[in-house]
């Protein structure tokens, strides 16, 4: 049986997160979704840009992630911006709570993908970049692009 490429299962990515934050660590978490939500996710109608993870009473929740209403969902449709529970081990949630308590640290979703038929989200422990850090990153990326262009000819 032919193996699928890993990127083929990626349904949404948060490219802005890598630009705005230094990603220190990543965790894979399951997402508790309703029927119409998983159908919208499979149709790639997910926006992660403004999302973040909040820890409330020992549970992790994905906040401010927009999953469009399912077109065929009629009256059973979901609220596009509702909080969605993340499925993590208690020890992982405790680690994330400790990290989030530190000043300047946050937890952001990086990508949503399917793994063995289940929707998963890759969350990253992140530290915000300053404006000069962003400019430095852009400058380095431009230099790398110029070098590749120069040696390709």
From Swiss-Prot:
| Predominant localisation class | cytoplasm
What name is this protein filed under? Answer: SsrA-binding protein
Q: Name one GO biological process term.
A: trans-translation
List the HAMAP family hit by this protein, alphabetically.
SmpB
**Gene designation per UniProt:** smpB
What family is this? Belongs to the SmpB family.
Where, per UniProt, does this protein localize?
Cytoplasm
Question: What PANTHER family does the database record attribute to this sequence?
Answer: SSRA-BINDING PROTEIN (PTHR30308:SF2), TMRNA-BINDING COMPONENT OF TRANS-TRANSLATION TAGGING COMPLEX (PTHR30308)
Q: Which Gene Ontology terms cover its molecular function? A: RNA binding
Q: Which UniProt keywords apply?
A: Cytoplasm, RNA-binding
Q: Which GO terms describe its cellular component?
A: cytosol
What the protein does comes down to: Required for rescue of stalled ribosomes mediated by trans-translation. Binds to transfer-messenger RNA (tmRNA), required for stable association of tmRNA with ribosomes. tmRNA and SmpB together mimic tRNA shape, replacing the anticodon stem-loop with SmpB. tmRNA is encoded by the ssrA gene; the 2 termini fold to resemble tRNA(Ala) and it encodes a 'tag peptide', a short internal open reading frame. During trans-translation Ala-aminoacylated tmRNA acts like a tRNA, entering the A-site of stalled ribosomes, displacing the stalled mRNA.
The record's InterPro entries line, in alphabetical order, gives:
SmpB, SsrA-bd_prot, SsrA-bd_prot_CS
